Regions:
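Short linear elements at protein peripheries
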Residues: 147-165
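Hydrophobic alpha-helical membrane-insertion signals
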Residues: 140-148
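A structural motif corresponding to the C-terminal lobe/cap of the Radical SAM core domain
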Residues: 1-141
Length: 165
C-alpha cells in the first residue's frame, strides 16, 4: 500500500516517540517496488525515512510470492522472472531483501536495487546507529535497549553494505 502521509510526518514521529518513551523499540517496515512507486515516490520515502525516528528499519523490495493475488496478476501480465516453484525458492531466499524477480512498472530494476542499498546503508551508517542508540539510552535509561539497537543495526547494515547491485 502507499505510505499514508495525510496526517504528516510529525504525527508519525509523535506516535513513534510516544512508544519509545514507554520503552518500546520501533521497527519500521518498508516495502518498495510496487506498481505505484516511481522515482518521486522513492524520493519522498527517503525524506520520510530521514525524518522518522525508527530504531530499526527493514527496507526491502516487493516479492511476489506464489499463491498471492499479486503473483497471479504479475504472472498474467508476464512480468515474473521466477515461475518454477518450489525450485525457485532457493533464488528467492538468497535475495529476499534486494532481489527484483519481476519487472517493476515505473522503475528499472537496477535503480530500485541501488536505491534500497543506498538508503539502507545511509540509515545504518555507524554514526546514525550510535546516535539512535544514545537517544534510546537517554530516553529509557536502558543499556539493554540501546545495545539491542546497536547489535540489530550492525547486523542489518551488512545486508545493505554487502548487497551486490
Amino acid at each position: 500500500k502507499k505510505l499514508n502521509l495525510k496526517y504528516g510526518v510529525e504525527s508519525y514521529n509523535r506516535l513513534v516517540e510516544n512508544a519509545q518513551r514507554r520503552k518500546i523499540l520501533i521497527v519500521g517496515e518498508m516495502i518498495v517496488g510496487t506498481d505505484s512507486d516511481d522515482k518521486q515516490v522513492l524520493e519522498k520515502t527517503e525524506q520520510f525515512l530521514d525524518t522518522i525516528n525508527f530504531d530499526i528499519l527493514r527496507l526491502q523490495i516487493m516479492q511476489p510470492l506464489p499463491g498471492t493475488k499479486l503473483f497471479d496478476r504479475l504472472a498474467q501480465e508476464e512480468r515474473l522472472d521466477l515461475k518454477d516453484f518450489p525450485e525457485d525458492w532457493r533464488k528467492l531466499a538468497n535475495e529476499f531483501t534486494m532481489g527484483v524477480h519481476y519487472q517493476p512498472k515505473n522503475l528499472d530494476r537496477k535503480t530500485l536495487q541501488r536505491w534500497v542499498k543506498r538508503v539502507g546503508t545511509k540509515f545504518y551508517s555507524p554514526w546514525r546507529i550510535i546516535k539512535r542508540a544514545w537517544k534510546c539510552f537517554l530516553n529509557t535509561l536502558s543499556p539493554r535497549m540501546a545495545l539491542t539497537i546497536i547489535v540489530m543495526s550492525f547486523k542489518s547494515r551488512k545486508t545493505y553494505v554487502n548487497a551486490k547491485v
